[in-house]
Amino acid sequence: MPVDFHYGVRVDVTLLSKIRRVNEHIKSATKTGVVQVHGSACTPTLSVLSSVGTAGVLGLRIKNALTPLVGHTEGSGDVSFSFRNTSVGSGFTHTRELFGANVLDAGIAFYRKGEACDTGAQPQFVRTTISYGDNLTSTVHKSVVDQKGILPFHDRMEAGGRTTRLLLCGKTGAFLLKWLRQQKTKEDQTVTVSVSETLSIVTFSLGGVSKIIDFKPETKPVSGWDGLKGKKSVDVGVVHTDALSRVSLESLIAALRLCKVPGWFTPGLIWHSNEILEVEGVPTGCQSGDVKLSVLLLEVNRSVSAEGGESSQKVPDSIPDSRRQPELESPDSPPLTPVGPFGPLEDASEDAASVTSCPPAAPTKDSTKRPHKRRSDSSQSRDRGKVPKTTFNPLI
């Protein structure tokens, strides 16, 4: 069966080795995620996506890390290919191998098996080739391309010109993360994160408790995080309007932890107009390469928690209820005796007949039992020990 080569890129392993620390920090979350090659066909972007908690999406995007192969015929247009980071039934993890320390060269190729003339068909398989530094060892891994095609959505968020954002200093971020962990229980919890333009405060509310963080508003027009990174020991924010988001507590805790990479990123909050809260890793210094790390926290539906509370308060049918009406009588059952205000309405003759017809009750065993005699303290015969009997022994 002929093999149709569709698209291929060469990986800049030198750039990936410089940001290996970021991959080591998030490798537990991205192991079960998805690797994406998307963007322009001439300058594609390498991304790693993974779910965080119950309502969060982690995204690591690296630009200028992929170079298209010379044999690619379609030089213009956009590409979007997705495949699992860890293949099903295999222990091969793409990010672990591509970010390795002893990697000399790496390439990713997308192809399909079928007629070569079918140029419009999507690729079916991906082949990852890795050569190591000893010039002898190499690895070739083949896996399946996701046919559904996950569209890259991190770059489609609104531009950072009019967004409300807050940069947390290291001390505030550690204190907030500790407080959120103390409020966490085994159940799914929703935390409300609101920011006030007038008061210059951010409020985290859940379960009847709240935590308020004051920040210094930035009045000068800034572009992105560049105008906020100068004040390291102060919480600085740019607020254009009041904003509110309801997110999962589990996802928020994980996002603050993942976006805190010592020497690389510190967490910052962004409120989007579509009620999505984004926790972005703000670079702390001059980084090598265009790397972006962020977690999108989706809006949690309030009706889900309300339905859960009603279902927990529902009384099961097996518990008897005194307010229930009496069951209907069958035609074979005897009629009920009407009851008056002072007792059942019956004739005196019927009462007398019922009394005389009943035989006397036989005495029970408990009633015939003789009463227990109380032992007196003066009786010393019962307090003495058992005296052995003296009998005739013929052997003596």
Curated annotation (Swiss-Prot):
Gene3D superfamilies: 3.70.10.10. It comes from the Viruses. It is found in: Virion tegument; Host nucleus. One of its GO terms (molecular function) is DNA binding. The keyword DNA-binding applies. GO terms for cellular component: host cell nucleus; viral tegument. Pfam families: Herpes_DNAp_acc (PF04929). Belongs to the herpesviridae DNA polymerase accessory subunit family. This is DNA polymerase processivity factor. It comes from Human herpesvirus 8 type P (isolate GK18) (HHV-8).
